[in-house]
Amino acid sequence: MAWTPLLLLFPLLLHCTGSLSQPVLTQSSSASASLGSSVKLTCTLSSGHSSYIIAWHQQQPGKAPRYLMKLEGSGSYNKGSGVPDRFSGSSSGADRYLTISNLQFEDEADYYCETWDSNT
């Protein structure tokens, strides 16, 4: 099987809340991996917001965004309807991870994380 690079882009999406101190999410600009391999995308919450819940979304070229999962600081996650088992979430401190295993052509997309104040 020939090595085929797969480019995954994940720009930042931040859902603003009414709190005084707004969380900031940091994501790397892009990642690439080959078909059949795994990739781990990171979304980091700013200081003082490490307990916030985030959501991961996928936007394939020419399509509307798709909700993938809600991810808590404990690492517990709930996936959206029809999201393949190849997609999983995990957490460590302020970092929230989206892992995609056994990469497929259709995984080439933009990946966004967003957060909100779960107390509002």
From Swiss-Prot:
What are the boundaries of the region Complementarity-determining-2? 71-77
Record localization: Secreted; Cell membrane
* Top-rank taxon, per record: Eukaryota
According to the record, the residues making up region (Framework-2) are: 54-70
SMART domains per the UniProt record, alphabetical: IG, IGv
This entry carries the following GO cellular component terms, namely: extracellular region; immunoglobulin complex; plasma membrane
Subunit info here reads: Immunoglobulins are composed of two identical heavy chains and two identical light chains; disulfide-linked.
- Which function does this protein serve? V region of the variable domain of immunoglobulin light chains that participates in the antigen recognition. Immunoglobulins, also known as antibodies, are membrane-bound or secreted glycoproteins produced by B lymphocytes. In the recognition phase of humoral immunity, the membrane-bound immunoglobulins serve as receptors which, upon binding of a specific antigen, trigger the clonal expansion and differentiation of B lymphocytes into immunoglobulins-secreting plasma cells.
Per its record, how is this protein called by name? Immunoglobulin lambda variable 4-60
The species this protein was found in: Homo sapiens (Human)
What taxonomic classification does the UniProt entry list for its organism? Eukaryota, Metazoa, Chordata, Craniata, Vertebrata
